[in-house]
């Protein structure tokens, strides 16, 4: 299986590093390319033991899966450049935010299968939650192979393309939303009189430990919460205060704003 990666930004690097480290693919069958920084590309390719090239004919020849990881505003120029070299065997996997499958096919001037994936930055540690949507001309074997590739850097949720907006909001942007919540927790903890460094380190370990509890337990998060909440205790006192605020509405507004922006970005013709 030959894989080609167009674009070598942070997300693309996290993805193909995960694939290289977690699959049985031969490094000689993996090709990287970027827009222009050959020195950085060469160094990264040599570090991973894979190939790099700027020759589109070489890259696309016999390529099974072609990852489109360029910045969205660079895609039209990339499509113009590579479309003369596309073969019938190329399946495209886009990690570009906001660019619909139909637009990708239109710019590439082909009817090759196209999948869109929406990972998050946790791909860097092999724990992305990645939404994926397929064009209707994928065969089952190719779908399975792509799912296996994506699972190399986390878990997969297959949805319709329209629902990628919701996945973008919930899991794509999710790490940033959680970081923001944790930031506020640190600020509040510091106001109790502890040193900021102590609070930050404590909360980092609190997050790690709580995540492991969720990972290793078959219980719901609600049940895990109940298990550590004693009637009349300190935890109950804090939760009673939290329940005075409509946290659900706050998060609904947050997620809806992200969904709306994702939809706006996908309206290519309006830009």
UniProtKB/Swiss-Prot annotation:
The keyword Amino-acid biosynthesis applies. Pathway: Amino-acid biosynthesis; L-proline biosynthesis; L-proline from L-glutamate 5-semialdehyde: step 1/1. Gene3D superfamilies: NAD(P)-binding Rossmann-like Domain, ProC C-terminal domain-like. InterPro entries: 6-PGluconate_DH-like_C_sf (IPR008927), NAD(P)-bd_dom_sf (IPR036291), P5C_Rdtase_cat_N (IPR028939), P5CR_dimer (IPR029036), Pyrroline-COOH_reductase (IPR000304). One of its GO terms (molecular function) is pyrroline-5-carboxylate reductase activity. It is an enzyme of class 1 (oxidoreductase). Keywords: Amino-acid biosynthesis, Cytoplasm, NADP, Oxidoreductase, Proline biosynthesis. GO terms for cellular component: cytoplasm. It is found in: Cytoplasm. It catalyses: L-proline + NADP(+) = (S)-1-pyrroline-5-carboxylate + NADPH + 2 H(+); L-proline + NAD(+) = (S)-1-pyrroline-5-carboxylate + NADH + 2 H(+). The keyword Oxidoreductase applies. Its main location: cytoplasm. Its EC number is 1.5.1.2. GO terms for biological process: L-proline biosynthetic process. Belongs to the pyrroline-5-carboxylate reductase family. Catalyzes the reduction of 1-pyrroline-5-carboxylate (PCA) to L-proline. HAMAP family: P5C_reductase. This is Pyrroline-5-carboxylate reductase. It comes from Staphylococcus aureus (strain COL). The gene is proC.
């Amino acid at each position: 299986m030959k894989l080609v990666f167009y674009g070598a930004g942070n997300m693309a690097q996290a993805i193909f590093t995960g694939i290289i480290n977690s699959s049985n693919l031969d490094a000689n069958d993996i090709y990287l390319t970027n827009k222009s920084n050959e020195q950085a590309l060469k160094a990264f390719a040599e570090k991973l033991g894979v190939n790099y090239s700027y020759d589109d004919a070489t890259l696309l020849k016999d390529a099974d899966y072609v990852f489109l990881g360029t910045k969205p505003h660079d895609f039209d120029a990339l499509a113009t450049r590579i479309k003369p070299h596309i073969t019938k065997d190329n399946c495209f996997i886009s990690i570009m935010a906001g660019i619909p499958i139909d637009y990708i096919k239109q710019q590439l001037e082909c009817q090759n299968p196209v999948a869109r994936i929406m990972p998050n930055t946790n791909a860097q540690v092999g724990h992305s939650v990645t939404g994926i949507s397929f064009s209707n001309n994928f065969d089952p074997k190719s779908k399975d192979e792509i799912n296996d590739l994506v699972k190399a850097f986390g878990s997969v949720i297959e949805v319709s393309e329209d629902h990628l907006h919701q996945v973008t909001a919930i899991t794509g942007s999710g790490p940033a939303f959680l970081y923001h919540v944790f930031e506020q927790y640190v600020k509040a903890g510091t106001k109790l009189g502890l040193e900021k460094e102590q609070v930050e380190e404590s909360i980092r370990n609190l997050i790690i430990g709580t995540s492991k509890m969720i990972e290793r337990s078959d219980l719901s998060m609600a049940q895990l919460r109940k298990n550590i909440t004693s009637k009349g205790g300190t935890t109950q006192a804090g939760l009673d205060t939290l329940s005075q605020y409509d946290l659900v509405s706050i998060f609904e507004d947050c997620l809806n704003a992200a969904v709306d922006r994702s939809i706006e970005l996908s309206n290519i013709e309006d830009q």
